[in-house]
Amino acid sequence: GLGDVYKRQLIMYKIIEVKQSVFEDNNKDANKLREECKDKGVFLLNVMSSPGAGKTTTLSRTLERLKDTMRIGIMEADIDSDVDAKTISEYGVRTIQLHTGGMCHLDADMTRQGLHEMGMEDLDLAVLENVGNLVCPAEFDTGSTKNVAILSVPEGDDKPLKYPLMFQVCDVVLINKMDVLPYFDFDVDKCKKNILYRNSNAKIFKVCAKTGEGIEDWCNWLENEVKALKE
């Protein structure tokens, strides 16, 4: 009857209200954190991708190249393991593990806690390796200076069309695993077109974390961005 319809509407309304206030509060926190990072000269990089796209390997390559030129700290977000944090800590950079307790993303407040725990005053570059997921992490602003999405060749060139928000919020997209291009039906030009359709300002780098292809261009870009923040 009508009562049921009303109840259903009420439930929907409540859910929307709660979600909206969560986003609004998070956006305020994120903007505050972005200001704090800028004031302290810390470049906060938020790295997102689906599981297995090569976040940790790409980060390892990036660290190899940049760890001697700047002070870097890494925050590894995982639902419940520390495998990635162990891998990264072998590079001798400050690494902390953030367990999200089952949540599929990090928000600005968790990121802030992680940064303070790491001692952000002593960092030039703080990298947040977000939870492997193409949906939730894109919805929550972490307060980052820049967002990076890693898209691997085996995932397909249509990912930017299927996950619009991820590619809309990203400043940079790394097309990773270029070494397996011959074995997959992946059109690089089409992929670039799809990315730019979602976000005409996105920077795109073709890389292979395994062989090191394209990593230098990506690292040069990042190094210049980190310097520019301090000017």
Residue ranges of model-derived segments:
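Conserved Switch II/interswitch segment of TRAFAC-class P-loop GTPases
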Residues: 133, 143-161, 171, 178-185
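Short beta->alpha connector loops at strand-helix junctions that form conserved
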Residues: 97-100, 151, 176
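Short, small-residue-biased leader/transition segments that mark boundaries at the very start
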Residues: 1-6
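Short, glycine/polar-rich helix-capping loops at beta-to-alpha or helix-loop-helix junctions
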Residues: 81-85, 159-163, 187-194
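Canonical P-loop GTPase G-domain recognition
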Residues: 181-231
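Nucleotide-state-sensitive switch-loop elements of NTP-binding domains
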Residues: 14-35, 40-48, 53, 57, ...
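Cofactor-binding loop segments of dinucleotide-utilizing enzymes, especially the Rossmann-like FAD-
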Residues: 77, 152-153, 209
